[in-house]
């Protein structure tokens, strides 16, 4: 998958080799209350590399001050869904599947 962190229509961070969590931490520190978007790469084969979101993703958002997560419905693996939603709710993080 691919992650980008944005605030007020400005890109704070784009995921590189360091991975999703490092991108979130870097971007969130540059723009508090930022939005994290996690999507599949163009022409990505869902059989081999599915974008994933879990409690570690939400923990990184909490640590960096990001306030919303946007994921691609039907193309993102949400592990431990109940725990992810509860943790996000507890910390005021909105999750949108589009």
Task: Give residue ranges: language-model regions.
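C-terminal binding/interaction regions
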Residues: 59-98
């Amino acid at each position: 998958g691919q992650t980008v962190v944005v605030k007020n229509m400005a890109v704070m961070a784009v995921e590189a080799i360091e991975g999703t969590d490092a991108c979130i931490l870097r971007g969130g520190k540059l723009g508090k209350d930022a939005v994290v978007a996690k999507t599949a790469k163009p022409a990505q084969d869902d059989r081999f590399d599915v974008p994933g979101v879990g409690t570690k993703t939400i923990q990184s958002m909490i640590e960096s001050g990001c306030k919303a997560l946007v994921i691609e419905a039907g193309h993102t693996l949400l592990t431990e869904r109940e725990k992810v939603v509860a943790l996000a709710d507890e910390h005021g993080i909105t999750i949108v599947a589009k």
